[in-house]
């Protein structure tokens, strides 16, 4: 028995030392939405969709690109400036600027930009949906923690009552008014109450860990929730939460319904994009270009070497009046030296000016036959519209079913709460009468323990029903689009 009291004292000390900052529901929800991995992933997808939407809007503007090249050529090659074959080493450089723009394609670019923008908006509503789902889950886990904490308190009160009974019974046994069996029965009950307390406290800690996991918090960090007054939690009347009214509001407030409406609009615009593939495309394009080249060697003059055959390797001759005459031509040696770095770039600006060229042109592409791809794309786009419409309809039907189910669950929860409240009142009266009869020796300790356990079970059940009722009413509020309010 002494070890039992020591164990109970240790649990009480652990609770007393829990002085960490307490988290209320609002803080839990905000933290979960900000740090939950699923919310982060949805947010990344929304940002990607926003980038795609921005890029699609810019596609209607002209595309412009510039280019430049610098290099050296060796051996036999074509000089890009003179277009003549050359065997000397030379430096070359070129510049270019080109651009193009689509002028007409049955609104393909504009409609594509609209589709991308709608998809970006739908992705944002996906983030809201996941955040809403996380908020509702946090509220459920939070209420579960509160219920577990209250259950710990109930078991503590139970232990206190049993300890009081133990003290009274021990005195009466010592006085010879009761047999020792009564004392043994109370001691057994105290051990049972202690076991219930330990189980309740362990369940509370496990629920705390579950909530930390949902919040993506480190389990090693101390964490405790704030306990609001359960009687001050605002609960609307059923008149404000009639399922037909809640459903009409939910159609305009629930993120999934918003996303479905947006995606249906995007699917219809995608039909126009697919249809554009069957129409001609008119585009305009042009470019500006210039180049420069220069040999690594420069000519400094020529040296006269004498005369030689007009055609090297052949004795060229002509006959005049029967007399042969040999034809010779002067021979020269071209003198060249290497250019230095500054000389290589001689005439750079002049060459670029002389070689500057421009062109502009229009292009018309008319789809004649493409293996039925354009027609198939158009048909798929129309079928996709019907598919999205069915998805939207199914989601609305599911929403309506969920709302009516939530309303029925809330009604049943209220009935269970009322019944359990009456059960507590009855059990409390029975226990009070039993305690008085036990004090005067008109009731056995076993009967007293039975009444005490009945009261404990009634209180635990009432507590569970109360938090269950609050959560189910919050679910209805959630469908109205008002979020978690306590």
What are these regions (language model features)?
Residues 1-25, 36, 484-486:
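Bacterial Sec-dependent N-terminal signal peptides
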Residues 18-69, 75, 219, 226-272, ...:
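Bacterial Sec-pathway N-terminal export signals of envelope proteins
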Residues 40-44, 57-58, 89, 103-131, ...:
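Sec/SRP-type N-terminal targeting helices
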Residues 44, 58, 195-217, 421-482:
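Short segments within alpha-helical structural elements
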Residues 70-74, 103, 288-292, 366-368, ...:
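Transmembrane beta-strands of outer-membrane beta-barrel pores
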Residues 74, 219, 296-306, 340-344, ...:
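Acidic, low-complexity, intrinsically disordered peripheral segments
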Residues 93-99, 246, 358-364:
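Hydrophobic, lipid-facing positions within transmembrane beta-strands of outer-membrane proteins
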Residues 133-249, 409, 413, 433, ...:
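Periplasmic alpha-helical coiled-coil/stalk elements that build and connect Gram-negative outer-membrane
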């Amino acid at each position: 028995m002494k070890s039992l009291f020591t164990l109970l004292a240790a649990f009480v000390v652990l609770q007393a030392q829990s002085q960490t900052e307490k988290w209320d529901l609002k803080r839990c929800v905000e933290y979960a939405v900000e740090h939950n991995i699923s919310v982060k992933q949805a947010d990344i997808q929304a940002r990607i969709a926003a980038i795609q939407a921005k890029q699609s809007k810019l596609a209607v503007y002209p595309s412009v690109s510039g280019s430049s090249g610098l290099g050296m050529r060796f051996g036999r090659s074509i000089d890009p400036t003179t277009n003549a074959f050359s065997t000397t080493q030379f430096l070359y450089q070129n510049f270019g600027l080109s651009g193009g723009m689509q002028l007409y394609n049955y609104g393909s670019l504009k409609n594509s930009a609209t589709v991308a923008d709608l998809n970006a908006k739908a992705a944002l509503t996906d983030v809201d949906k996941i955040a809403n789902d996380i908020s509702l889950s946090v509220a459920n886990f939070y209420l579960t923690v509160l219920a577990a904490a209250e259950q710990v308190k109930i078991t503590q009160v139970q232990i206190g009552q049993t300890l009081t009974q133990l003290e009274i019974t021990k005195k009466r046994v010592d006085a010879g008014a009761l047999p020792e069996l009564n004392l043994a029965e109370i001691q057994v009950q105290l051990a049972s109450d202690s076991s219930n307390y330990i189980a309740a406290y362990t369940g509370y800690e496990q629920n705390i860990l579950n909530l930390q996991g949902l919040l993506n918090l480190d389990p090693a960090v101390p964490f405790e929730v704030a306990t609001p007054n359960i009687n001050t939690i605002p609960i609307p009347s059923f008149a404000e939460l009639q399922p037909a009214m809640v459903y009409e509001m939910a159609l305009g407030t629930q993120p999934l319904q918003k996303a479905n409406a947006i995606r249906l609009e995007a699917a219809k615009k995608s039909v126009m994009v697919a249809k554009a593939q069957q129409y001609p495309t008119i585009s305009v394009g042009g470019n500006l270009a210039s180049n420069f080249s220069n040999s690594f060697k420069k000519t400094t003059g020529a040296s006269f070497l004498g005369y030689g055959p007009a055609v090297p390797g052949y004795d060229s001759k002509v006959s005049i009046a029967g007399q042969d005459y040999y034809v010779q031509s002067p021979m020269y040696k071209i003198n060249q030296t290497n250019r230095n770095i500054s000389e290589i770039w001689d005439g750079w600006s002049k060459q670029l000016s002389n070689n500057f060229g421009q062109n502009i042109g229009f292009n018309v592409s008319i789809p004649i036959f493409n293996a039925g791809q354009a027609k198939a794309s158009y048909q798929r786009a129309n079928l996709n519209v019907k598919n999205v419409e069915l998805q939207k309809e199914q989601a609305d039907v599911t929403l309506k079913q969920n709302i009516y189910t939530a309303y029925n669950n809330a009604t049943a929860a209220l009935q269970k709460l009322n019944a359990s409240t009456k059960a507590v009142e009855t059990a409390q009266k029975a226990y009070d009468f039993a305690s008085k009869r036990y004090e005067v020796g008109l009731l056995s300790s076993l009967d007293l323990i039975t009444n005490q356990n009945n009261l404990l079970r009634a209180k635990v059940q009432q507590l569970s029903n109360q938090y269950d009722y609050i959560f189910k009413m919050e679910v209805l509020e959630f469908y109205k689009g008002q979020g978690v309010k306590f």
